[in-house]
Amino acid sequence: MQTYNGYANYETWLVSVWIDNDQYTINYWVDVAKHHYNISEDRKYFTKKEEAIISFSEDMKEWYGDRVPDSDDIGGLFSDLLHAALGSVDWHELAGKYMEQALENVEC
């Protein structure tokens, strides 16, 4: 499987770069990760941390997807391209990365 700069693909790397280059944004996502960890619990098949990463990744995907302008505003082609790019992002990988940062030397 081909990767890009250590990430699953270019799209995943790009989202990470944009998050990491803005202190407010990274703080926001680390706080959201902490929240998901705090409300999660061990399940039959997943640990508390795994459960938190799953719900956190879904939250990230929804948050970014909701920010794509309606196709009426930017044209069908461009809306479709944005959705395709966001659909290629490995949200689970990113959620895992920011969950690690949230749990690093911090008592949730």
Kindly give the residue locations of the regions a language model identified.
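Acidic interaction surfaces
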Residues: 1-108
